Amino acid sequence: MKYDDLIQELNTWEYDEKIYREYYFMKKTPEKVKDFVKSHSDHELEVGWVLNPELLHQNAGEDEFISEKYNVSLVKHPRYLPVFYHEHDFFEIIYVLSGTCTNSFRDSTEKLTAGDLCLLAPNVRHGILAVEDDSIILNILIRRSTFMDIFYNTVRDKTQISGFFVGNLYSREKIRYLLFHTKDDIVIRNYILDMYREQKTSDSFSDRIICSILTLFFVELTRRHGKK
């Protein structure tokens, strides 16, 4: 698939997104909520999440979100899903392909716009909210061991990114996240779309190819946007 086709596919509305959007804009009167639940009775899970977002995973392990045969997983964050605070034991990249989102922490909130990229350390409590129709937010979930392998093999210069690696692997005072404003950097965008496309291929070679692309991604991110 071409890049434009991948973006068009990602922009397609999933049914759960339609449910979340409807609830976001509707008046929350008891009657309206009752009608809402009834009209989506065949999607109890999604309705439960939108009514009680605290039911979503608050503490997640790698194997809950990353398939056993993969080291990396790319997931589109649903538009209009109510914000829920959670943490997990793997690394995460939040990339804004288009539109905007907010990423909230215990003591601060970052507003991300198209091209922004947030590199998030494990066990950092946060919540994401994307409430614009044109928002496409990709979450890249990376096993801790995979992240370490990439660091040892590629990211060795004294840059902001290498400091993030070292701090989270060895230091008591960890860097919670790094924020990059890549703006309209097509190189960075295309590496992410390449990983997404390969995940769709899903054959016996896909995991190795995705990990290789991820390695190139981090090297290019360091070269093009890493602060020394």
What are the language-model segments listed below?
Residues 67-162, 207:
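N-terminal regulatory/effector-sensing and dimerization cores
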